[in-house]
């Protein structure tokens, strides 16, 4: 999972997927049985800041895959929104890990949130 906070990343991979990852766009690439990829900062005069998370699948020998989703509208509502899920949450990118939900948000000043109940919680 890649989530850009500031700047832009260009993604290319051996499956023919290519695109620009920008703030508010969540991207998932599953290596599966094998994939090559590159991610490059598009702006030479500006740093890019991003979060990248590896979530091991709960199934072996899956095919490589790629998905991206613009979540800006959900983030503007405040609170937390599911960015990626193996549990079928609406609007989330699908991941091959039934026990995982990755939440994110753009909190407003003084806004607080409650972490949703889950079998495993990492903050």
Predicted regions and their residues:
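Jelly-roll (double-stranded beta-helix
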Residues: 2-123
């Amino acid at each position: 999972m890649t989530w850009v906070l500031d700047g832009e990343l260009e993604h290319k991979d051996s499956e023919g997927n290519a695109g620009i990852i920008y703030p508010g766009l969540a991207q998932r690439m599953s290596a599966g049985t094998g994939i090559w990829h590159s991610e490059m900062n598009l702006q030479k005069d500006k740093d890019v800041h991003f979060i990248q998370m590896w979530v091991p699948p709960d199934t072996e020998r899956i095919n490589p895959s790629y998905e991206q989703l613009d979540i800006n509208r959900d983030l503007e509502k405040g609170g937390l929104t599911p960015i990626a899920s193996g549990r079928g949450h609406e609007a989330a990118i699908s991941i091959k890990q039934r026990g995982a939900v990755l939440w994110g948000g753009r909190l407003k000043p003084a806004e607080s949130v409650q972490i949703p109940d889950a079998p495993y919680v990492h903050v």
